[in-house]
Amino acid sequence: MPQLEFTWWIINFFIVWTADFTLLIVLSIPNLSTPTTLSKQLDINKSHVTWQWS
């Protein structure tokens, strides 16, 4: 059955290329696994204020 073999070849071709592109995207974003950049952006300046009641 050459049609079935060709169909499986097409399916495997797209599976391999999808996996390759997914791996490429994951490896091209090195800061994805480190949340330190996000926490640095969300850092709030905390200062101590002395209230004077008059």
From Swiss-Prot:
GO MF annotation list: proton transmembrane transporter activity
Major location (coarse): mitochondrion
Gene Ontology cellular component list: mitochondrial membrane; proton-transporting ATP synthase complex
Pfam family name, one: ATP-synt_8
Domain of life: Eukaryota
Coiled coil: none
InterPro entries per UniProt: ATP8_metazoa (IPR001421)
Entry keyword Coiled coil: no
Localization annotation: Mitochondrion membrane
Keyword Transmembrane helix: yes
UniProt KW keywords: ATP synthesis, CF(0), Hydrogen ion transport, Ion transport, Membrane, Mitochondrion, Transmembrane, Transmembrane helix, Transport
Bilayer-crossing regions: 9-29
GO annotation (BP), single: proton motive force-driven ATP synthesis
Mode of membrane association: Single-pass membrane protein
Complexes and interactors: F-type ATPases have 2 components, CF(1) - the catalytic core - and CF(0) - the membrane proton channel.
Its job: Mitochondrial membrane ATP synthase (F(1)F(0) ATP synthase or Complex V) produces ATP from ADP in the presence of a proton gradient across the membrane which is generated by electron transport complexes of the respiratory chain. F-type ATPases consist of two structural domains, F(1) - containing the extramembraneous catalytic core and F(0) - containing the membrane proton channel, linked together by a central stalk and a peripheral stalk. During catalysis, ATP synthesis in the catalytic domain of F(1) is coupled via a rotary mechanism of the central stalk subunits to proton translocation.
Protein name per Swiss-Prot or TrEMBL: ATP synthase protein 8
Source organism: Arbacia lixula
